[in-house]
């Protein structure tokens, strides 16, 4: 993917980039993949199980997942990536030449190779999906508290409470999902994770004339 960088931010980003590049070796990549795979390998099935019979289920769609290449040679040049994917069960069906347009009419005629993974899925409206999940969470007894978290209190490196601005919530486990702002919260846990900001994006087309 293309990278757009504000150059005045580069000095601040450099320590993270150095660590990132240090992990860009085959041995380190394999180790990272081994740890990530159990989290994401069955994510489609996990989503289906989570929302089955709830109002969030309507936002899920079964689908294929396709990697697009202009030529078969370009696909072959990506052999290492596919070797790793196949080791974890992601083995593609190749569609070549004019058959690509038959499979996906929305693609440009100069796309001559497509690697297709079966049994995938997508969410038609991320906002609608998480809103429905939030509603299910509350209906099942979940409690929503909107307050500033000041600290994660620990004993022997284990969390025992979440310190809010005006109260303390006793807990055995806590999930920290505040991205780059997690740094200060996890200090007490003696967890050192190199974190940096990344501007993300998501586009939803309303009533598109064509779909994959």
Predicted regions and their residues:
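N-terminal glycine-rich dinucleotide-binding loop that anchors FAD/FMN and/or NAD(P) in oxidoreductases
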Residues: 1-4
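Residue-level detector of anion-binding/catalytic polar loops
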Residues: 91, 143, 192
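A conserved short coil-to-beta-strand element within the FAD-binding core of flavoproteins
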Residues: 94-104, 122, 143-160
């Amino acid at each position: 993917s293309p990278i757009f960088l504000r150059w005045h931010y580069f000095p601040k980003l450099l320590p993270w980039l150095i660590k990132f590049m240090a992990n860009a070796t085959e041995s380190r990549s394999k180790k990272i993949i081994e740890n990530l795979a159990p989290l994401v390998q069955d994510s489609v099935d996990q989503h289906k199980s989570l929302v089955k019979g709830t109002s969030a289920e309507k936002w899920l769609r079964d689908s294929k997942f396709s990697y697009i290449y202009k030529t078969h040679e370009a696909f072959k040049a990506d052999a290492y990536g596919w070797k790793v994917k196949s080791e974890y069960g992601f083995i593609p069906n190749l569609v070549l030449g004019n058959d690509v347009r038959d499979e996906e009419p929305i693609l440009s005629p100069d796309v001559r190779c497509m690697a297709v993974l079966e049994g995938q899925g997508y969410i038609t409206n991320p906002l609608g999906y998480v809103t429905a999940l939030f509603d299910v969470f509350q209906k099942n007894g979940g409690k929503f508290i909107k307050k500033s978290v000041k600290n994660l209190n620990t004993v022997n490196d284990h969390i025992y409470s979440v310190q809010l601005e005006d109260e303390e919530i006793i807990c055995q486990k806590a999930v920290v999902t505040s991205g780059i702002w997690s740094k200060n919260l996890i200090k007490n846990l003696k967890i050192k994770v190199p974190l940096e900001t990344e501007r993300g994006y998501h586009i939803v087309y309303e009533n598109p004339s064509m779909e994959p």
